[in-house]
Amino acid sequence: MELSPQLVKKNYGNKVLDKFSAINQLISIIENSEDLQARIESIRILAQINANTEIVFKLLENLLISDSYEIIRYTAAIVIEKVFLDVALEPLKWVFKHEESLRCLLTACNILGKIDSIQSKSLLINSVKRIKNEKIAKNLNLLFEKREIDSFSSLELSKIVENYFIISDLEKKFGQISYQMKDGLIIKLDLSDVSSHVFGWTILNKFPEFMEFLTSLDSLDLKFNRLTAIPDTISLLASIKYFDLSYNKIKSLPDSIGSLNILKYLNLRYNKLKELPTSIGSLSSLTHLDLRANELSSLPNTIRKLSKLELLDLHGNNLSKLKVSFKGMNSLNQLELGLNNIENLPRCVKSLKSLKRLGLGGNKLSILPSWIGSFQSLEALHLFDNKLHHLPNSIGTISNLKELTLWNNHLTSLPKSFNALSNLKILNLSWNLFESLPSWIGSLKSLEILSLWGNKLESLPKTLENLTSLRILDLNFNNIEETPSFLSQLEKRGLIIYK
């Protein structure tokens, strides 16, 4: 039977092999196998069985310094940290001088911070002093004016060096990038659209593995790249508040995203998400969740736990029904449900009494429930591109409504209650079936834009002259032959009429 690391581990666990023999067999695999995964697993098992012999240390030291595979060097460094931390300094010095792999450099730096000896601190101080990046050096000079460099612990210094390594690597790959630092640590990082700056082989199609080292990062912008997945390690971004992943190709989110409990802004628009993890409800600080233009057909019930959420954008998904509860989402003031497959306004929306903006355009609504009038805080209501034949009388009770878009429906009239919409500024009735307008439309004294494009109007009520705030009147594609003379006074005041 071919020797395998799993078999060695099993035989050692069953006491078929003693520790010395198990170590020798694992070393044999590491040195002789052509199976990379078997070599990696053998190195890891050395840590699991606490193989703290000198021969093992020499092997790991040699792997760290000279193996051609980055993953082998990285794994060797991890095992040295776990088993040989007290003697790790010398091989780590070599890594600092000669290693080019970012992952290995970051791991070595992290280990040095944990050693916390005079020698490791000296190595880190020298590394900080050798930083030539002008922007980082300037930030560090300000930091060291407030506090002597010698007063920093090895761990604090290692974080500064790690952040420098990361910026250096990013600038090498993508050229100039945008970032902000505070006290030597990156707090804001903009990698949006970096793939367009460089040749194809350096496109950003994987989530940057170094992110776990950016423990002070509060803003990360990765929009307009080619990411397809988010790793579980996203949970390590404990300081993140602003996270933009829009315009990528992300198909799913890990459960660990729920660990980002101070995250306020999450933008995932224009991805390929088909579902959300239930852990999304654990984002207790979230105020902005943008899921526009994905492939969602449902929402998890845990969405109701987002009590601080102010904006939820679900425009352009595959939603037909919302079988969730929004009770408790008292902060939600903007809900976008446009361009879905909704035939009936979901009853769960009724509980959202703080809504100021409700987007329902581009659905299959043929009727509105009377409770639409219960949204007393609503300022903008978008119902364009549906199948509405009439509006409920209750719509006139939405006293704060300022914008109402109803273009491309099947409306022939407006309810009399409409004249109570005294704050209405924008009314779009284009591409409906109106043959006339009610005389009371002149009571909408706040109206600034009235769009009537593409109806069957032959005349206009004289009461339109009372709309002294009107700035734009669109009459294109109707049957009106001449502009009524009573509108001339409004034109003199600046009214623009499109006809």
Where are these regions (language model features)?
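Charge-rich, solvent-exposed alpha-helical interaction surfaces
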Residues: Q25, I29, I45, L59, ...
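Amphipathic alpha-helical scaffolding segments comprising HEAT/armadillo-like alpha-solenoid repeats
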Residues: L17-I30, A51-L64, L85-K97, S117-K129, ...
